[in-house]
From Swiss-Prot:
Keyword Zinc annotated: no
Gene Ontology CC annotations of this record: plasma membrane
Catalytically driven reaction(s): fluoride(in) = fluoride(out)
InterPro entries with a match to the protein in the record: FluC
Protein name, per record: Fluoride-specific ion channel FluC
Gene (UniProt): fluC
GO biological process: cellular detoxification of fluoride
Summary of the function given for this chain in its UniProt record: Fluoride-specific ion channel. Important for reducing fluoride concentration in the cell, thus reducing its toxicity.
Regulation of protein activity: Na(+) is not transported, but it plays an essential structural role and its presence is essential for fluoride channel function.
Species classification: Bacteria, Pseudomonadati, Myxococcota, Polyangia, Polyangiales
Localization in the cell: Cell inner membrane
Xref: NCBIfam families: crcB (TIGR00494)
Keywords annotated in UniProt: Cell inner membrane, Cell membrane, Ion channel, Ion transport, Membrane, Metal-binding, Sodium, Transmembrane, Transmembrane helix, Transport
Length: 127
């Protein structure tokens, strides 16, 4: 039951952080393109890559902390459903090019961010 609590608390923190960053991005860059969702997914991919690498190669994270950070915080922070909804809206109301650009940018940049997170974690662990 304790793990559920920490996952839920992490999820709440991640959701609030996502809302804050998405709102800031929309105010800063406008609402013509889903910059906020792209930002949270790229940052979340990087952090999840780092968390996964640290959990796999060290004993720095207890199983409960790992779940709280990965499933909780990163699960609440990142958002695949918003990515889907915003991409559909771009295609439906703006242009196919904007929707396809969102798909390509999100997939490529998030994968690269995840790998970069793993590499950075490895280097930090190695000293």
């Amino acid at each position: 039951m304790e793990r559920w609590f920490w996952i839920g608390l992490g999820g709440a923190a991640g959701t609030l952080a996502r809302y804050g960053l998405s709102t800031w991005c929309q105010q800063r860059f406008g609402a013509e393109f889903p910059y906020g969702t792209l930002a949270v997914n790229v940052i979340g991919s990087f952090l999840l890559g780092a968390i996964g690498e640290i959990a796999a190669t060290t004993e720095l994270l207890s199983p409960t902390l790992r779940l709280s950070l990965s499933t909780g915080v990163m699960g609440g922070f990142t958002t695949y459903s918003s990515f889907n909804n915003e991409t559909i809206r771009l295609i439906e109301y703006k242009s196919w090019a904007a929707g396809l650009a969102n798909i390509a940018i999100t997939l490529v940049v998030c994968l690269l961010a995840g790998v970069l997170g793993m590499v950075v974690a490895r280097r930090l662990i190695a000293g």
